[in-house]
Amino acid sequence: MKFKIDLHGMPITKAISKAESVLIEASFDKNMQCEIITGKSGNMQQRILDEVIKPYKFDYYIPPHNTGTIIVTQNEL
């Protein structure tokens, strides 16, 4: 299932909390793919990676054509 979260312009603490709750809920679907829109804020993107995506060991990539987005997929355990 595909999910999309737009965090652009959101306060960083609220954005981290929202990303975490959506990714945890979405992770129950083994075919999950979530597009997280951070905008061009390198700080927000790095914090989402460091505080949500990496600790939960999700797979992710940042598309070269849209660096304000993180694509997250489920890592099979």
Where are these regions (language model features)?
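Long, charged, low-complexity intrinsically disordered regions
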Residues: 1-77
